Amino acid sequence: MFFIVNKGKEINPILKFSISSIFYTNNFNKDNSKEFKSEINILNNDNFRSYLAGLIEGDGTFAVHNKNSTSKKYLPKIIIVFKLTDLPLAEYLQLITQCGKVYKKSNRGYVLWQIQDIVSVFKISNWINGYMRTPKIESLHRTINWIHDYINNNKNSKLTKIQNILSKIHYLEIKPNDISEIESNAWLSGFSDADANFSINIHKRTNKNSTRVQLYYRLEIKQTYHKLDSDDNKVSFFPIMSKLAGFLCVSVYSRSRILNNKEFYSFTVVSHNKKSLLKITHYFNKFPLLSSKYLDYKDFLYILELQNKNKLTTSYLGEAIKIRKDFNSTRTTYHWSHLKNCYLIKT
């Protein structure tokens, strides 16, 4: 069953309908006590935990009050940003985790999934602990340390509210970054839903009277983490980008650009040759994307398959031109059937 959403129309009711329809079809929105939603099931699902870690490392933020600061104290929270068109994914993740709330910021063009109660922050931290791969793990460790301090500072409390919280949280092992092979879990799928894109480029060859269709998978992130390490040194994202490049058999590119009179530096990996495209398609066929980028990937894959079957560009050029009219930023139609029975809820 496909659920179609058109840009330019009121989006929220349709998106909500599509998600609830998928849920009810699978009989897992009827009873909030369904076992698949329990922490024990998610703890047994490496794909869910690694996907969520990648998504948070790409588009998520841990906000933790500095205990040495004199500013107003606040509870820790986790905020994940989505494109407005990815509201169904945000609602889907909120529903299966039962953590936080989803806020649609139509005037700003994005959606927030915000987790800020202590128990939910603990759950998310517990689930992704051991699955992160970037310098952002520092913020997870700060969150876990905050939880440990909360337990220590309140273990003798007689307040019912605090006792209830303490009954649902516990000390966590502070685990290091995951160093397993990239292809071993769904981390790259979550990270790509946050920071990657697919391209179908069509251009005329300068020295030939012909047209070329080029396909790219591209992932770009900033070069350094915003906090210094314990020795006051910058922490680079190069190690993880180098590992991704090794997996894809490509190189890491560095670039700088100026936005609003400020210079930004980033690392990029690009799949563009036959070997790297084969690698990335095998990966995403095993661990599918879950955002609307899944639709771009399927179109990208369709053209790649035509390209591999046909030596003449003219045999599939028309299809490539047609697809580009409803692709990436020009996309106007969406469906979310790929969330139905997806690997996040299978153990």
Task: Identify the function of each model-found stretch.
Residues M1-T347:
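Internal intein/HINT superfamily modules and their associated LAGLIDADG
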